[in-house]
Design a protein with these regions (language model features):
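Universal eukaryotic N-terminal targeting presequences
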Residues: 1-2, 122
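Beta-propeller-forming repeat regions
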Residues: 15-380
Length: 380
């Protein structure tokens, strides 16, 4: 793996040193492991792990701390994404699920369902289909109006008429309001693949915005006070010609008070990019161009120095953590968390209650789920 020249490979000069992690296996046999979500599913104050595996017919969760396996629902096919949030206030989240996925939209059922428990989340949940939108691919809950009530954001991979993902058609972003569950279009401005979405209160006004990452680059979607969605380009992503252009997954972090945007680029790409704003323009810096089939990116302050690290997982295979080397986020150092984890997805949460953020990742070709215990900064 080649790191670009401005990435430092020496001892961390600023902030706390890199963190030590201890790896723990939660589960194996998760064929086509694709997503892990960290959420308290049984209202006991401990964060559990939901594992979605596209090659399985069961959606399962593992109960913290012993990681006992429970089946949420079965007889499912081609599951691709889920999101969890307690919409009725009973302390146990509801789950929205996208299934029936195929890479080519004309072969994708695009089933969107709502899953609710029947009183005991350790038993089977009710599954209610609410929509079919071909190529439904990413789901997130978002409080778009600051009311405290969230809606479901659904991002298909491509236009429903696309024969291949590379077709240059407009790709919609839609939403569902709990209760009515009627599909509402947010935008159809994107072209080609839109692979990732990220929910963030971008401007600190108490309302969530949406970041999208796709062939068209990285864009911010914000609902105005008069109910109109506004779309703003943050960056174009990889400048290569179509369809090797744009972005794939996106996350937001901070180095001190300074915000940055982290991305995997292009689609399922080989690059980890950091964007920093200067004079209204988001400047692109590729800090690693040696990953393979990049598929997940997150930020968190693992060592408590006030500077978020970047976690990048790739199915090619590996999980890396990048540490800022200065107070501006201009220089970064890479450490390898796990060279044997073909991470399709990771999640960040305090899984053992010690106040430190831990990492969980699910492997695609290895069909396993692991969590990485944050042991604190290494001694120097």
């Amino acid at each position: 793996m080649r790191l670009l020249g401005y990435v430092l490979c020496c001892t961390v000069a600023f902030g706390a040193p890199p963190v030590r992690f201890a790896a723990h296996t939660v589960a194996t046999g998760l064929k086509g492991g694709y997503q892990v979500v960290a959420v308290d599913l049984n209202h006991d104050g401990k964060t559990d792990l939901v594992a979605l595996a596209s090659g399985m017919s069961e959606l399962v969760w593992y109960e913290n701390p012993g990681w006992e396996r429970h089946v949420i629902a079965d007889h499912l096919s081609e599951m691709i994404n889920l999101a969890a949030w307690d919409m009725d206030g009973d302390g146990i989240p509801e789950i929205v699920l996208a299934s029936g996925f195929a890479m080519n939209a004309n072969k994708s059922a695009g089933i969107v369902s709502v899953l609710q428990h029947n009183g005991d989340p350790r038993q089977m949940w009710r599954v209610r289909e609410i929509d079919r939108l071909p190529a439904s691919h990413r789901l997130r809950w978002a409080d778009i109006d600051g009311s405290g009530h969230k809606v479901v954001i659904s991002q298909p991979l491509t236009n429903a008429a696309a024969v291949t993902p590379q077709d240059r058609l407009h790709t919609p972003m839609v939403m569902y309001r709990p209760g009515a569950w009627k599909r509402e279009t947010i935008s159809s401005a994107e072209e080609g693949v839109v692979h990732g979405i990220y929910i963030v209160d971008w401007d600190g006004d108490g309302r969530d915005e949406i970041l999208s990452a796709g062939f068209s680059g990285i864009h911010l979607y914000k609902l105005s006070r008069d109910g109109v969605w506004n779309r703003t380009e943050i960056a174009k992503g990889d400048p290569a010609p179509w369809p090797k252009c744009g972005s794939s997954d996106v996350a937001v972090g901070h180095v001190g008070e300074r915000r940055f945007v982290a991305a995997i680029e292009p689609w399922h790409g080989n690059q980890v990019a950091i964007y920093r704003e200067s004079g209204g323009v988001w400047q692109r810096h590729v800090i690693d161009d040696g990953i393979a089939d990049g598929h997940t990116i997150w930020t968190a302050d693992f060592n408590g120095d006030g500077r978020d690290e970047v976690v990048a997982g790739y199915r090619g295979k590996g999980v890396n953590i990048y540490y800022a080397q200065d107070g501006e986020g201009a220089e970064w150092r890479k450490t390898v968390l796990d060279s044997d984890m073909p991470a399709a997805a990771c999640a960040i949460a305090d899984l053992n209650g010690d106040g430190r953020p831990d990492i969980a990742c699910i492997g695609s070709s290895t069909a396993n789920l692991k969590w990485y215990e944050n042991l604190g900064p290494a001694r120097q």
